[in-house]
Amino acid sequence: MITQAMIENFPPSPGVYLMKSADDTVIYVGKARNLKKRVRSYAGDTRDSRIHIRFMVQLVHSVDYLVTDTEKEALILENTLIKQHRPKYNINLRDDKTYFSLRMDMKEQFPRLSIVRKIPSDGARYFGPYASATAAKEVLKQLYKMFPLRHYPLATCMARKRPCLYHQIKQCSAPCCGLISAAEYAALAHGAALFLEGKNTEVARLYRSKMNLAAEQMRYEDAARYRDLLRAIEVTVERQKMVAQSDDSDVFGLHREADRMQIALLHIRGGTLTGGRSFLFDWELETEEGLASFLNEYYDLDAPIPPQVLIPVPIAEPAALEELLSEKAGKKVTIAVPQRGPKLEMVKLAGKNAETAAQERLARESSSATLLTELAEKLNLPHPPRRIECYDISNIQGEMAVGSRVVFIDGRADKSLYRRYRIKGVLQSDDFAMMREVLSRRFKAESSEEKPDLIVVDGGLGQLGVLNAVLDELEVTGVEAAGLAKSRVARDMESEEIERSDERVFRPGRKNAIALRQSSAPLLLLVRIRDEAHRFAVTYHKDVRSKVLTGSELDGVAGIGEKRKKALLKHFGSLKRVKEATLEELKGAPGMTESAAKALVERLHGSPLPNPPPPGEGAMDRK
């Protein structure tokens, strides 16, 4: 427990404190403006009845501290130590989701919109964020109906001899074939950028003036084009969810249930609600402290930082977090707790989203708990398996072999815990040996990771035997095992009838499979987990095979690494066009040097290509 004697020598300075258990494990990391005052609030003889006091008194054996010069430094150090120690009672926010943005480089000839994950400082304009690639693609799909910009890389477009199919459905203006002037295309690109920024009134004004000008100059086709654009924009704007405040903001709402906190996030960009996210984590301390810790970790995950962050409750030392976020964003960022008006309404809406997400989660957990209890009964497990892992192998006659691991928590896939393995120690086609390697690597290299309650392997008694052998050899305890054999298909050569056997579940110590009704929920869950492991393994195997087969001709060329290789394929559109390119065309590609271009030509063609003869010379040689 924490005593006054422990903190007697703590300084009244900014810093970070580390609470440790009896075995010297860090169980909580916190920051403070005044270390002595903050840690004293946790002391065991206090009359404070808050929930965090009970757990601290029971578990904390010692407290260490690190002094910093400023509160901002304490904030940064706290985040670093949380990542290093991953304390049990801190928020360990591992976000497997990546935000997506739309990119447009206005300096490019005939600018094009593309979906990207990262936002580098390259002078291009970026719009978003969007919580998923699906959301970004939907926005792009609607934009093309209003602003028919080109869809493909410039090199691909310019290589075309006729307009693409998108032009036929009026979603591309075909600049590659000269069907739109550079000035008119620039107006389209400018309008798309304004629209994505939420400046719909400016877009309408821009195109209305261009429509009127075209009509006055009797360019009736152009006038009709702008008229159609205006109509499409008006229809789309009517469908959009608009909010009363126009500042770009992230709006947070929260819902607290005992030791769990649900946070909802709404993204507002250009006055439009562009998307939202929901987060759930265990938290036994004060709500305000949990929110502050969450914000620090969330924006440390390369999440886009808007100029305004709206939160439902005050947090300690907001100025330090504002300073840190402003430094990361390269612009002033404010954190505010709205008291009235439309901003307060948005925070309330985010809170309502958090409460709804919590209610849906409870309903799912109740259903999952029933399902996992039934699964435990059917497989004779000691308790419902909260964490289930499944492994699969994919290869072609032992070549390019890979393994996969998928993880289901409370009956739902947790993709942040998925893992992929390149098989290193097995050269021949031996699925059993490959499975042994994958399982051994999982429990050797990742021994600190949470153990599963149940491991499912894709296979029957053979693969189950491998799993049991690995668990015994590595002395892994408390982990149950099961094998799920795929349905077998047998065709009678004399008839068209197909006989399918049932899915079979095997457990250690049993020679025969466990009889489960084929439509039962427990079996369907196991099949879903097995199929997900198979999908993940096959997808990875295809990626590996694709890199080996298609990337080999560009690999190993002096001066051409992964970055230049990607740039070449993007510029020319395909490996075939790279091989058809002349030395001069290769030298002119983005990021290429003359020496790298010559090395590539030698690799692709065996010797340097001769320079073309000057005009008027070499006629006799060509006869």
Curated annotation (Swiss-Prot):
UniProt xrefs under InterPro entries: GIY-YIG_endonuc, GIY-YIG_endonuc_sf, GIY-YIG_UvrC_Cho, Hlx-hairpin-Hlx_DNA-bd_motif, RuvA_2-like, UVR_dom, UVR_dom_sf, UvrABC_protein_C
Residues covered by region (Disordered): 603-623
Coarse class of the protein's main subcellular location: cytoplasm
GO biological process: nucleotide-excision repair; SOS response
Keyword DNA repair appears in the UniProt entry: yes
GO molecular function: DNA binding; excinuclease ABC activity
The keyword DNA repair is assigned to this record: yes
Compartment(s) of residence: Cytoplasm
Domain GIY-YIG: 12-91
PROSITE patterns attached to this UniProt entry: GIY_YIG, UVR, UVRC
Pfam families, per the entry: GIY-YIG, HHH_5, UVR, UvrC_RNaseH, UvrC_RNaseH_dom
GO cellular component term, pick one: cytoplasm
Domain annotation UVR: ranges: 201-236
Highest taxon above the source species: Bacteria
SMART domains linked: GIYc, HhH1
Keyword annotations from UniProtKB, A to Z: Cytoplasm, DNA damage, DNA excision, DNA repair, Excision nuclease, SOS response
Oligomer status and interactors: Interacts with UvrB in an incision complex.
HAMAP family (alphabetical): UvrC
NCBIfam families per record: PRK00558.1-5, uvrC
Chain's role: The UvrABC repair system catalyzes the recognition and processing of DNA lesions. UvrC both incises the 5' and 3' sides of the lesion. The N-terminal half is responsible for the 3' incision and the C-terminal half is responsible for the 5' incision.
Similarity annotation: Belongs to the UvrC family.
Protein name (Swiss-Prot/TrEMBL): UvrABC system protein C
Species whose genome carries this gene: Citrifermentans bemidjiense (strain ATCC BAA-1014 / DSM 16622 / JCM 12645 / Bem)
Primary gene name: uvrC
